Amino acid sequence: MNDGWFERRTHQWTEWTPQRLVELKRDTGTTVSLVVPARNEEATVGRIVSRVREELIGRVPLLDELVVMDSDSTDATAREAAEAGARVHRTVDVRPDLGHHHGKGEALWKAQFVTGGDVLVFLDADLVEWDTHFVSGLLGPLLQDPGVELVKAFYDRVLDREDARPTHEGGRVTELVARPTLALRWPALSGVVQPLSGEWAIRRSLLRELTVPTGYGVELATLVDTHLRRGVDAIAQVGMGLRGHHHQSLHGLGAMATELLAVADRRAGAGPGADAVELHQYGTGGKTMTTEVGLVERGPASRVGPPPDRPEGPCAREVAGRC
């Protein structure tokens, strides 16, 4: 673990009131976009959007825009989000000239083309135990210290089990894949409590320079790449208290783990060169289940030209959207 980093860069959300954050936001001239990537989350996304709009746009003007990126949903996710007051973009419709890939990382990468904030805050759409400080708390280190460029949330997790007691453990993939990988390859990041947390914030100026995996590897890749490009002190973390969300099956986590290992291998110079691999898993009686795991990574958004129907040259930079 990097000497002294944990003490310097670990915070609690209670250190900043929303009113204080608004003052810092005004003093620094910073604009903030909240992005909620969602796929088939009709049961939760509307409540999340409504609550955030009420507290962080209506009660205090902390957010400049709230965008839901609908990632190939087959349910009413888009309708629920729009009716709750979000601006909704279907990922497949954003910059169609650049093609489309399935996955969370694709939604976050494409969000750069439909948002305008200096800071992007990402919030998962499947939360069931949470509050709006999951958003506001992430902004404290960024608004207070210009040297901070990436902020990760950490929390006590409420697991889907009968006793429902909070635990300091990370998720299964965090404890079995991400944390050991960091310990072996990037030990300076071992102090990051929740390296795969879906709640994080980043300066646009940094994100637009990063390569972004289109799937679940986006959080690990962003963490490692920030460390490699800016140093560990550009990263901070904020404790948020309790967090509850829906969990994937063990087989589903196998695909996630595969993506994370690919992210780590690429950043360690060990490959892989393929855009996808086949993951073979086994069920009852040795029944074979084969999943194609996508390993595509999007290049830096800063290198992407304007859409074919727009002229070359700078566009007006508005919080309502970007060219």
Give short role names for the model-derived ranges.
Residues L120:
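Short aromatic/hydrophobic "clamp" motif used to bind/position activated sugar donors
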Residues M1-E54:
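N-proximal low-complexity "stem/linker" segments adjacent to membrane-targeting elements
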Residues D124-W130:
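The conserved acidic donor/metal-binding loop of glycosyltransferases
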Residues H168-V263:
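Conserved catalytic loops of nucleotide-sugar-dependent glycosyltransferases that act on lipid-linked
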Residues P96-K104, L108-K110, W130-R204:
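Acceptor/aglycone-binding surface of glycosyltransferases and processive sugar-polymer synthases
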Residues M1-E7, R51, L250-C323:
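Terminal low-complexity segments of carbohydrate-biosynthetic enzymes
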Residues D70-R79:
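A conserved acidic beta->alpha catalytic loop
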